[in-house]
Regions:
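Active-site neighborhoods and metal-handling regions in enzymes and metal-associated proteins
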Residues: 1-286
Length: 286
């Protein structure tokens, strides 16, 4: 027993990650049975606190991941044509990620066409794109397990006016949040800034998700670490330099559309910076 070899066999107070994906109830029960003279206490938040602020070296790796996402997103744009399916476009995106040095992600790319985009954590689909259609992308990339992600929506032909107004509101919401984020500001304030934009544009009922969540090291079954800290109404801890987030404000109208735009960012000493270099703009392929 490793704990016994380390002199922790009895009479010790040992922290365990009760909220970890890979520490099961059965494993916890086994520890208590074979080492009954130890006290096992919850230590998850100690680990979360150590992961919340990234070093410059960690941010640099995440910038590299963001560059992979940019390449994959552009490849996805190119492959999005009438008649193509979301599954086919997903194949192009994955090929681009792995050919350029990416590693397996915490979650697959979420690439959805037309009305299927209203349920954004579906994967793919085999229904061909129409001449006047939309394609929703939420893609991550991983390098040395450090993750960056990006959400975009592109349009084919002549998009509906409502789609374009929603897209503009989502882009403006991202920008408003970035202008709010700085050391000392709170996630509540950032979420409010984004939500004010979509509300004033008339889409409050479609914008129901939190603004964003922490990102960093990730393994399946997730690419985020929102359990550590999220950009949401209920979170009031002050933001600090070195925190990294994926911010995907999106609007979902059931059986009609899912439209969103996002940025992965790092909080700096004076504000925040994008990790991606891909423009956050409306793209229409005619």
């Amino acid at each position: 027993n490793v704990l016994q070899q380390l002199g922790l066999g009895s009479g010790k107070r040992i922290g365990v990650e009760k909220q970890g994906f890979f520490f099961t109830v059965d494993e916890h029960q086994t520890l208590m049975e074979i080492l009954p003279d130890n006290e096992f206490v919850e230590a998850t938040e100690i680990l979360w606190d150590s992961r919340m602020i990234k070093s410059q070296e960690e941010v640099d790796v995440m910038r590299h991941s963001a560059s992979l996402v940019d390449m994959a997103m552009l490849a996805g744009y190119e492959a999005t044509v009438p008649g193509a399916t979301a599954d086919q476009v997903s194949g192009v995106v994955n090929k681009t990620l792995f050919e350029n040095g990416g590693e397996y992600m915490g979650l697959p790319p979420f690439i959805l066409a037309g009305e299927r985009s209203c349920l954004p954590h579906q994967t793919g689909g085999n229904v061909p794109l129409l001449d006047d259609d939309l394609m929703y992308f939420e893609i991550s990339a991983s390098k040395h397990r450090y993750t960056a992600a990006l959400m975009r929506t592109i349009f084919l032909g002549t998009p509906k006016e409502e789609w374009l107004r929603v897209a503009e509101a989502c882009i403006d919401a991202v920008q408003a949040a970035m202008e709010t984020i700085k050391p000392g500001a709170t996630p509540h304030e950032a979420d409010t800034a984004a939500r004010d934009v979509t509300s004033k544009a008339g889409f409050a009922e479609y914008h129901r998700n939190r603004l964003g969540y922490s990102i960093g090291v990730a393994y399946p079954p997730d690419w985020g670490e929102g359990e550590i800290i999220s950009l949401r109404q209920e979170e009031h801890r002050p933001l600090q330099p070195g925190m990294t987030f994926h911010m995907p404000p999106l609007c979902l109208k059931y059986r009609e559309f899912g439209i969103g735009f996002s940025e992965s960012i790092v909080v700096t000493e004076t504000g925040c910076e994008r990790l991606s270099k891909l423009p956050c703009e409306i793209v229409i392929k005619s």
